[in-house]
From Swiss-Prot:
It comes from the Viruses. The gene is VACWR036. InterPro entries: AB_hydrolase_fold (IPR029058). It comes from Vaccinia virus (strain Western Reserve). This is Uncharacterized protein 36.
Length: 44
């Protein structure tokens, strides 16, 4: 889901808590990939 200004996104990680970087390896990898993709899409 994207906010109208396209600079914000929300993604729900089922079963994850507040500190996503401290979750299971699967969640951590997914979070880092999402962040990477978000940044690259805005700097190109």
């Amino acid at each position: 889901m994207q906010h109208a200004n396209c600079n914000r996104e929300i993604k729900i990680y089922e079963g994850a808590k507040h500190h996503l970087h401290k979750e299971t390896d699967e969640v951590k990898k997914s979070v880092m990939k999402e962040i990477e993709t978000w940044i690259f899409n805005r700097v190109k």
